[in-house]
């Protein structure tokens, strides 16, 4: 930015900044936040008109017609969740992403296990996202993580997520942890652990610093599920077998401890 403009940047009124920033792309907004403290302060308000406008431009009106985004209360957080949502180009051919951008629908195809990955993978930091299953689970309903090398569709009804060394999953049907084709015990470690009920909120917590994967159900921490994860890029992933089942995923950002 020109030195003369930088000198006067802190003195630009908020209403003028709002007008200027409303014409910028997201990457430009990120750069603007680095110009001066005043601009950083303005853009740190995740509910201001600039973020609202960006949110309305990028998200479908269908995304606001449900309570899915209630877990990400600010406009900037909703926008971030959209960019982390299911990838329509990285899912089984029997799956399509609904107009809201956050929910996948598995078509009623017999003898097929079908999955989907999120748009963005993680190799560093701590990340959390919420998964909600709508419709019957069938014999396989697995939630977890996978690399780009993991299969996303296979013939038959099979615990695809966790079937190889590139994926880790929790089968909500029988509460088994799955990796590399093996069951790694019941989860959570409770006597007669309750089964997942359709509509309950599952929170997936990936800690790339400690190399662990954990889960919460209805805001109750269930414990660490997997440890010693390799240094790879992991994507939010699910695998399903039941026809017309729908699975929503909302990225939350870093998990809140406590």
UniProtKB/Swiss-Prot annotation:
The keyword Lyase does not apply. GO terms for biological process: negative regulation of synaptic assembly at neuromuscular junction; neuromuscular synaptic transmission; proteasome-mediated ubiquitin-dependent protein catabolic process; protein ubiquitination; synapse assembly involved in innervation. It is found in: Synapse. CDD domains: F-box_FBXO45 (cd22111), SPRY_Fbox (cd12907). The keyword Signal does not apply. PROSITE patterns: B302_SPRY, FBOX. GO terms for cellular component: neuromuscular junction; SCF ubiquitin ligase complex. It comes from the Eukaryota. Residues 6-54 form the F-box domain. Pfam families: F-box-like, SPRY. Required in the presynaptic motoneuron to down-regulate the levels of wnd and restrain synaptic terminal growth at the neuromuscular junction (NMJ). This is F-box/SPRY domain-containing protein 1. The gene is Fsn.
